[in-house]
C-alpha cells in the first residue's frame, strides 16, 4: 500500500511537470490571438513587438490548444526595443481596461521581433 502511495505521488509530480506552460505555448496563443483580429504578427515590419494580458491562473491544455488572449498590444516599425515595449504594453493595457479584465490578467511582453520575452 505504501509503495502504491509513493507511485501515485511520483505520477502526479511527473504529470505536473509535463503540464507546465512553455514560453512557446504563450507565443502560439499570442499569434493565434492576433490572427483572430486578422493581424499576422509574422508579416509585420521589423522592430515589432507584442504584449498580451496573460491569465496564468486559468491557462490549461485546452486554452493552450484553442484559447485566445482578450487583451493584446503590438507595434512595428519602431525605433528601438524600449519604444516597442512601451507601444505594445500601452495597447494591451487599453484593451485590458476596455474589456474590464484588470483582475484576471496582467499585460506582459511576449515578443520583440522573434525574441521571446515571456517571463514565466
Regions found by a protein language model. Give the residues of each.
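Secreted/extracellular ectodomain signature
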Residues: 14-120
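Classical Sec-dependent N-terminal signal peptides that target proteins to the secretory pathway
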Residues: 1-17
Amino acid at each position: 500500500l505504501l509503495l502504491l502511495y509513493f507511485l501515485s505521488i511520483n505520477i502526479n509530480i511527473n504529470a505536473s511537470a509535463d503540464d507546465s506552460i512553455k514560453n512557446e505555448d504563450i507565443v502560439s496563443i499570442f499569434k493565434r490571438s492576433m490572427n483572430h483580429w486578422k493581424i499576422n504578427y509574422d508579416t509585420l515590419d521589423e522592430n515589432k513587438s507584442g504584449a498580451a494580458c496573460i491569465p496564468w491562473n486559468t491557462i490549461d491544455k485546452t486554452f493552450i490548444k484553442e484559447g485566445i488572449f482578450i487583451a493584446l498590444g503590438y507595434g512595428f516599425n519602431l525605433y528601438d526595443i524600449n519604444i516597442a515595449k512601451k507601444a505594445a504594453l500601452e495597447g494591451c493595457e487599453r484593451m485590458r481596461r476596455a474589456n474590464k479584465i484588470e483582475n484576471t490578467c496582467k499585460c506582459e511582453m511576449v515578443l520583440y521581433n522573434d525574441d521571446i520575452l515571456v517571463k514565466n
